[in-house]
Swiss-Prot record:
Gene: tagH
UniProt name for this protein: Teichoic acids export ATP-binding protein TagH
Subunit structure: The complex is composed of two ATP-binding proteins (TagH) and two transmembrane proteins (TagG).
One Pfam entry name: ABC_tran
Gene Ontology terms, MF aspect: ABC-type teichoic acid transporter activity; ATP binding; ATP hydrolysis activity
Record organism: Levilactobacillus brevis (strain ATCC 367 / BCRC 12310 / CIP 105137 / JCM 1170 / LMG 11437 / NCIMB 947 / NCTC 947) (Lactobacillus brevis)
Length: 361
């Protein structure tokens, strides 16, 4: 791997816990071990680079991890392990990505542009071009939740390409909409390519991939099956899909179950050890390989799972909050409660004898 990349992904994995219900998720929070919770690895050690000015296509079957990878690169979701280095501002285009359903199209344009770092005067200058490119008519003033998927794609694409990002990530955004808008999008992408923009293009349409992409990465059930010249990788992917379609219904289900089982059984520790051994073989004199690999795996990752220290702290804060509420409702002071904690649950009741006091003047 050279140093001319715009995007560098190294040893990236993504793990999800497969909770069957919210109750099971809550129980796991208080459990001493999460070994009983099934895990699913959407990505299992992806390493690749995207060069400056290159258009890289991502292909693969449904559920292979293409969108997961594009979301990690764009910073929408974090990776479980590995490093992601992006040299420049990214803008992702996916159906409805980043659009707020309760806001109008016009309000979403301003919000997304502000989030990309544009000022209000800059947005005002671009507004007519964005509106014209999206071409959604009076729906511009309606809440986005009333839009069709094609209209959401139009609006999202128009916003993304007009904020002038360094890196454009397009995730199935051209799969909806009419031919006229599709051609406008292709022309805009071609214009970006001519300007030397870096593009990651996710699509199920191999024709789109062949037209737009310089290289292609085939993501296959969480792994990088192949990366290389568009013609070569697309040819191999077509051979795979032809083979798969030729299987019986039973054989297809068996193949898919086996692939999903591999993703559930993936061992991150074994993968880490494999990387260590490969590096040691390449450089036997390096005594710090294990530490370097650990840093590559976890050095830039913020854990999505709570440590036990944080769990205990959260529980303690929750208990203190509940006690504070009970003290407030009971009407007693903190000192009274500390002397007689039972007052919180069974507050003392003082009975007054109205007959005894009625004659006092």
């Amino acid at each position: 791997m050279d140093n001319s990349y715009k995007i560098k992904v190294q040893h990236v994995t993504k793990e999800y816990d497969l909770y069957k219900s919210q109750a099971e998720k809550l129980r796991s929070f208080f459990s001493l071990s999460n070994s009983k919770v099934p895990h699913f690895w959407s990505l299992m050690g992806i390493s690749l680079e995207v060069k400056a000015g290159e258009t890289l296509g991502l292909i693969g079957v449904n559920g292979s991890g293409k969108s997961t990878l594009s979301n990690i690169i764009s910073g929408i979701i974090p990776q479980t392990t590995g490093t992601v280095e992006v040299r420049g501002d990214t803008s992702i285009i996916a159906i409805g990505a980043g659009l707020r359903g309760n806001l109008t199209g016009l309000e979403n344009i301003r919000l997304k542009a502000l989030m990309q770092g544009l000022t209000n005067p800059e947005i005002d200058a671009l507004m007519d071009d964005i509106v014209s490119f999206a071409d959604i008519g009076d729906f511009l003033y309606q809440p986005v939740k009333s839009y069709s998927s094609g209209m959401k794609s139009r609006l999202g694409f128009s916003i993304a390409v007009h904020v002038n990002p360094d890196i454009l990530i397009i995730d199935e955004a051209l799969s909806v909409g009419d031919d006229t808008f599709y051609q406008k999008c292709v022309d805009k992408i071609s214009e970006f390519k001519d300007e030397g923009k870096t593009i990651v293009f996710v699509s199920h349409s191999l024709k789109q991939i062949e037209i737009l992409c310089d290289r292609v990465a085939w993501i296959h059930y969480g792994t990088l099956k192949e990366i290389g010249a568009t013609e070569t990788v697309v040819k191999h992917y077509r051979e795979f899909t032809k083979w798969f379609k030729g299987q019986s219904k039973k054989e297809k289900k068996h193949f898919q179950r086996q692939m999903k089982a591999n993703q559930k059984a993936f061992d991150i520790d074994a993968y880490q050890q494999q990387v260590i051994e490969e590096r040691q073989a390449n450089d036997p004199n390096d005594q710090n390989v294990a530490a370097e690999v650990k840093k590559d795996f976890y050095g830039s990752v913020i854990s999505e799972k709570m440590s036990w220290g944080n769990r205990f702290l959260t529980i303690a804060v929750g208990i203190v909050f509940v006690l504070a509420c009970l003290i407030n409702v009971s009407g007693h002071s903190l000192g009274d409660v500390l002397q007689n904690p039972g007052n919180i649950v069974h507050p003392e009741t003082v009975l007054h004898d109205t007959n005894a006091t009625s004659g006092v003047k």
